[in-house]
């Protein structure tokens, strides 16, 4: 069983890693894909839910994208009976102005949106997950991110996940028992080189790639493990 754990970002699901070139475990985060939701979402509650599903708990290496990167760091803090050797946190948003947090909270409070067609629901999934233009609407990751009830469609994602909040990255990195690398695509609008370097001394920028670097060029991200 692989000890490589891949954690997706907000709005996506584990199928986003299908093109990854190495053996791995790629679960759905709570409230995404087929994973059960939680009464409320914090980085700790999400990490605990992920930890309970892991088939391997020792010498784990984690690549986490965006929200998944934060969950990876939370797991690396040692509070979940998971021995993490290394974390690559990719594309994590580290600056959270009040306006951004307010918008996220408002989204979390909205009711589930229903659509009359799969096409409409797929378009919404691709927008929410940041995969528009990168993934075909017919891709399995889209199917896994949708639910059909009778003749209507919705996202599998629990809107409450938007309320997970802003991570204390400095504390997460300081508390990590694992080696930590902060990585970003050169064109990622969610963060900057300077923001990451202010937090940590191991920063890698992937040339020409954007926020979903793991989808744009899985090999380039996988190379960070070598």
What does each model-identified segment do?
Residues 25-63, 77, 223:
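Active-site loop/oxyanion-hole signature of alpha/beta-hydrolase fold enzymes
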Residues 209-218, 222:
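Catalytic histidine-centered segment of alpha/beta-hydrolase-like enzymes
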């Amino acid at each position: 069983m692989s000890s490589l754990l891949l954690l997706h970002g907000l709005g996506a699901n584990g199928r986003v890693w299908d093109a990854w070139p190495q053996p791995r475990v790629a679960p759905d985060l709570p409230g995404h894909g087929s994973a059960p939701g939680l009464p409320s979402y914090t980085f700790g509650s999400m990490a605990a839910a992920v930890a309970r599903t892991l088939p391997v708990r020792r010498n784990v290496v984690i690549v986490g994208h965006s929200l998944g990167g934060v969950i990876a760091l939370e797991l690396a803090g040692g509070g979940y009976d998971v021995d993490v050797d290394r974390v690559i946190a990719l594309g994590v948003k580290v600056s959270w102005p009040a306006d951004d947090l307010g918008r996220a909270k408002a989204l979390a409070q909205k009711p589930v949106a229903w659509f009359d067609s799969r096409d409409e629901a797929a378009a919404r999934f691709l927008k929410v997950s940041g995969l528009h233009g990168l993934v075909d609407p017919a891709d399995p990751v889209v199917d896994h991110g949708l639910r059909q009830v009778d003749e209507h469609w919705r996202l599998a994602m629990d809107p409450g996940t938007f309320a997970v909040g802003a991570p204390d990255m400095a504390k997460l990195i300081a508390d990590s028992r694992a080696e930590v690398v902060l990585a970003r695509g050169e064109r990622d609008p969610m963060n900057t080189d300077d923001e990451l370097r202010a937090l940590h001394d191991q920063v890698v920028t992937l040339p020409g790639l954007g926020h979903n670097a793991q989808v744009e060029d899985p090999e380039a991200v996988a190379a960070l493990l070598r």
